[in-house]
């Protein structure tokens, strides 16, 4: 779905390592596909070699029908077009509630109404990147702010009809959780779900070891094809999601502008932080918090993650001489 701000998604590239799978009776099966404007890969220990791709596709299609900004018939598209007859489904209500929670705990740094600013700066669908004028920014800020939106009797109510919602900053994490809960409901104990780089893992891999997940080094302009792994973590019963500013930026008059926009000012955050990896009990919060931290910056982002229970962060930032440096919260364990 979600090419517009994930752009919030494409730079979150994680690489699952040491989880090579094989099919067969009772063996590990790997399935993959395309949804939400990106790829997904899922590995699970089967009962009898069963292929679950059709069921997974069905879950993700239902998810897109709720929240895809590219599906003209989705609930999100109709709501953004000010169709007031729409009664939101469970997907929409839950992602809205999570977004409101993140909006409140972040001091409005996390905001799914920010897409007009993203488009204004040229980080959206058409990729016409430029530094807008202050007047242009001010005019757009008038209809940015999740506190201008409520759900009343199942319907979305906006204080300004120009407000649009897009949940790219946490929706893929939410879809990871939805698929993971489905695996749990069927009794699967060992699996790894990755959608657009957002990961939830449970149990062990085909080698009988805890799943190992790689975190990319934030090299400017790097792609998924030429990524370099910065660190590796073991993961089971938790999610790991990343965000960074090294794949979607432009330079104008010697100044680097990244796509991580502060919804309260309308400008990209100027900070030494290059990327962050967040571990949390669920992917919707890990995903949303990763984006939030990039907007808040290194110091404030570290403080936020450190204050949250069962939540850890790994931060990669630039030193004054341009080298990479790292810091992490106390509970974030990196493999040696």
Where are these regions (language model features)?
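Hydrophobic h-region of N-terminal signal peptides that target proteins for export
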Residues: 11-20
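Mature catalytic core of soluble alpha/beta enzymes
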Residues: 2-6, 19-336
């Amino acid at each position: 779905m979600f090419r517009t701000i994930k752009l919030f998604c494409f730079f979150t590239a994680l690489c699952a390592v040491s989880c090579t799978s094989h099919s067969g009776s009772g063996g590990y099966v790997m399935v993959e596909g395309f949804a939400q404007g990106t790829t997904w890969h899922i590995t699970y220990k089967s009962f009898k070699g069963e292929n679950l791709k059709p069921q997974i596709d069905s879950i993700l299609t239902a998810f897109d029908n709720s929240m895809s900004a590219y599906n003209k018939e989705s609930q999100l598209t109709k709501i953004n077009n000010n169709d007031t007859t729409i009664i939101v489904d469970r997907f929409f209500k839950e992602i809205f509630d999570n977004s409101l929670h993140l909006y409140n705990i972040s001091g409005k740094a996390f905001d799914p109404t920010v897409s007009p600013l993203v488009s204004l700066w040229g980080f959206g669908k058409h990729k016409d990147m430029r530094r807008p004028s202050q007047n242009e920014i001010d005019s757009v800020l008038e209809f940015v702010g999740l506190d201008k939106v409520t759900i009343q009797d199942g319907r979305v109510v906006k204080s300004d009809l120009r407000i649009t919602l897009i949940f790219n900053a946490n929706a893929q994490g939410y879809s990871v959780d939805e698929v993971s809960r489905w695996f749990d409901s069927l009794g699967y104990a060992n699996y790894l779900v990755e959608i657009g780089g957002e990961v939830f893992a449970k149990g062990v891999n085909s080698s009988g070891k805890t799943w190992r997940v790689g975190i990319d080094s934030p090299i400017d302009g790097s792609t998924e094809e030429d990524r370099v792994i910065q660190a590796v973590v073991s993961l089971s019963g938790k999610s790991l999601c990343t965000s960074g500013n090294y794949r979607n930026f432009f330079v104008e008059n010697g100044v680097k502008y990244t796509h991580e926009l502060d919804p309260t000012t309308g400008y990209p955050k100027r900070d030494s932080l290059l990327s962050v990896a967040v571990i949390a009990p669920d992917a919707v919060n890990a995903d949303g918090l990763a984006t939030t931290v990039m907007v808040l910056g290194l110091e404030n982002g570290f403080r936020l993650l450190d204050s949250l229970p069962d939540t850890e962060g790994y931060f990669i930032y630039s030193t004054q001489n341009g080298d990479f440096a790292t810091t992490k919260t106390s509970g974030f364990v990196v493999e040696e």
